[in-house]
Amino acid sequence: MGLETEKADVQLFMDDDSYSRHSGVDYADPDKFADSGSDRDPHRLNSNLKVGFEDVIAEPVSTHSFDKVWICSHALFEISKYVIYKFLTLFLAIPLAFAAGILFATLSCLHIWIIMPFVKTCLMVLPSVQTIWKSITDVVIAPLCTSVGRSFSSVSLQLSHD
């Protein structure tokens, strides 16, 4: 139908002087960040996220719209997806990344400094607690249960129909 299926390749070239002058940050190794644009999802965390036109909108063979409608809807889908995604990431990506960083830093701090020491302390104290609990059970609960069991074992019931 005349649709272009190849992805557009966009590159931005800046010399080192203008890059460090405009950004205000002097990165130690610019080559480290040079390839970061090629694969931003190396662990395939979002592999199930299908946002291609063919993955979202499909017409069966028996019902096809006009070719011009299909081409225009495909173009409008791609343009709106591109523009809206860029717009949303422009305003939401940095605050959400900041919030996620705070959240993960807080959870990491809690895990490292509170939860794991508490778990290790419980595991350290557990054998002593187990010994004390066994002693209390043997001294108090076992004789009590034995005496209650003997008392109820001597009870006999007889039912009579009058």
UniProtKB/Swiss-Prot annotation:
Name by which UniProt lists this protein: Caveolin-2
Chief location category: nucleus
Family: Belongs to the caveolin family.
Intramembrane sections: 87-107
The gene coding this protein: CAV2
Source domain of life: Eukaryota
Subunit structure comment from the entry: Monomer or homodimer. Interacts with CAV1; the interaction forms a stable heterooligomeric complex that is required for targeting to lipid rafts and for caveolae formation. Tyrosine phosphorylated forms do not form heterooligomers with the Tyr-19-phosphorylated form existing as a monomer or dimer, and the Tyr-27-form as a monomer only. Interacts (tyrosine phosphorylated form) with the SH2 domain-containing proteins, RASA1, NCK1 and SRC. Interacts (tyrosine phosphorylated form) with INSR, the interaction (Tyr-27-phosphorylated form) is increased on insulin stimulation.
Gene Ontology molecular function, alphabetical: D1 dopamine receptor binding; molecular adaptor activity; protein kinase binding
Gene Ontology CC: caveola; cytoplasmic vesicle; Golgi apparatus; Golgi membrane; nucleus; perinuclear region of cytoplasm; plasma membrane raft
Positions of post-translational Phosphotyrosine modification: Y19, Y27
PTM section of the record: Phosphorylated on serine and tyrosine residues. CAV1 promotes phosphorylation on Ser-23 which then targets the complex to the plasma membrane, lipid rafts and caveolae. Phosphorylation on Ser-36 appears to modulate mitosis in endothelial cells. Phosphorylation on both Tyr-19 and Tyr-27 is required for insulin-induced 'Ser-727' phosphorylation of STAT3 and its activation. Phosphorylation on Tyr-19 is required for insulin-induced phosphorylation of MAPK1 and DNA binding of STAT3. Tyrosine phosphorylation is induced by both EGF and insulin (By. similarity).
Pfam families: Caveolin
InterPro entries membership: Caveolin, Caveolin_CS
Membrane is among the record's keywords: yes
Biological process terms in GO annotation: caveola assembly; cell differentiation; endoplasmic reticulum organization; insulin receptor signaling pathway; mitochondrion organization; negative regulation of endothelial cell proliferation; positive regulation of dopamine receptor signaling pathway; regulation of cytosolic calcium ion concentration
Topology within the bilayer: Peripheral membrane protein
Subcellular location: Nucleus; Cytoplasm; Golgi apparatus membrane; Cell membrane
Stated role: May act as a scaffolding protein within caveolar membranes. Interacts directly with G-protein alpha subunits and can functionally regulate their activity. Acts as an accessory protein in conjunction with CAV1 in targeting to lipid rafts and driving caveolae formation. The Ser-36 phosphorylated form has a role in modulating mitosis in endothelial cells. Positive regulator of cellular mitogenesis of the MAPK signaling pathway. Required for the insulin-stimulated nuclear translocation and activation of MAPK1 and STAT3, and the subsequent regulation of cell cycle progression.
Keywords from the UniProt entry: Cell membrane, Cytoplasm, Golgi apparatus, Membrane, Nucleus, Phosphoprotein
